[in-house]
From Swiss-Prot:
Taxonomic lineage: Bacteria, Pseudomonadati, Chlorobiota, Chlorobiia, Chlorobiales
Protein name: Glutamyl-tRNA reductase
Organism in which the protein naturally occurs: Prosthecochloris aestuarii (strain DSM 271 / SK 413)
Active site: C50
Summary of the function given for this chain in its UniProt record: Catalyzes the NADPH-dependent reduction of glutamyl-tRNA(Glu) to glutamate 1-semialdehyde (GSA).
Sites where the protein binds substrate: T49, C50, N51, R52, S109, E114, G115, Q116, Q120
Amino acid sequence: MNIISVGVNHKTAPIEIRERISLSEVQAKEFLSDIISSGIAQEAMVLSTCNRTELYVVPGMSEVTGHYLKEYLISYKNAEKEVRPEHFFNRFYCNTARHLFEVSSATDSLVLGEGQILGQVKNAYRIAVEEQSAGILLTRLCHTAFSVAKKVKTRTRIMEGAVSVSYAAVELAQKIFSNLSMKKILLVGAGETGELAAKHMFQKNARNIVITNRTMSKAEALAEELGTNQVLPFETFRDNLHEFDIIITAVSTKDYVLKAPDMHQSMQKRRLKPVIILDLGLPRNVDPEIRSLQNMFLKDIDDLKHIIDKNLEMRRSELPKVQEIIDEELVGFGQWINTLKVRPTIVDLQSKFLEIKEKELERYRHKVSDEELRRMERLSDRILKKILHHPIKMLKSPVDTADNIPSKVNLVRNIFDLEEQNQLKQ
């Protein structure tokens, strides 16, 4: 039983190709219904995010190969002009499992260790279950992938440390002021970067967040979303600088929004109580001369990128530990796959001996009492269990490679004449 994965991701195709081949949730459901009902797949799952669209398929027909699935998806999306099979990767059997384990543990992500991908894999599996396209193989594969991701998160540090500017800024603030809930924070700029920083602050229990923005309505909308409802007019926010322990700036501007005289005056009013300024703007929003002021700690994007680089280096150093976990789970998954290959032979073997037992007991059914017949049944069950123990154990033996299984199965089927058993069933 084979399982194939094909797809495009940030490693194999540029964004315009990934966009062209992506599938929404509705489209993914329609696609799954199509390839299952047409017999192309026995089982199937679609994983489609901003950085990847991948198919995981148990073929339903011998002609269904990786190339077949690539061409089918390209045609399904009417993307023949833009997308070529060369934009895709292919994986088969255990390499498919390894790929999904790496995806789920965020080692195949654009940002190493990013935390969203596991939820996206779980959502892809949920859709497959809802569409009844996840059978025994995909179910086991996905649950093993979830187990891998959990072990990676608990046993390694690959998801630790900020790797975005906004999150690095918040982590730095928390290192300096360990309890952010006790600090008053000013956010200058309610754009994407500022919004992310504010939300990260909120996740770290900061609640006293005041927002200022050139467009007041954007400041009010973000304040309402955070539940703070605290805003300041952009034209006059400098009058209140002395109130804040942490100031985050993230605006597009040619001029500094905070200058040394502003902060000098503020520090006089604060009686030199420490202030952290996190400048997330590019070009810089804050006059670098502010660094010279006493108890004023200014960090800009270059400082934060240094933190990010160290965190990424730390995450990369964890990769060997992650691969050990993946290799361990891959062995177990491969052994389980092998048991699927021998299961029909085990069923036939048990059926044959059960049939022999029933025939022999039937000969004595009217010659002995009911109690004696029950004792004979129990005795024959114990004998059969002992007779079948060794051949079944040999079939399930995990030491065998996939290449050895067919010869082992053929040996058992020939010794016990199980082909005749199949013919009798038919």
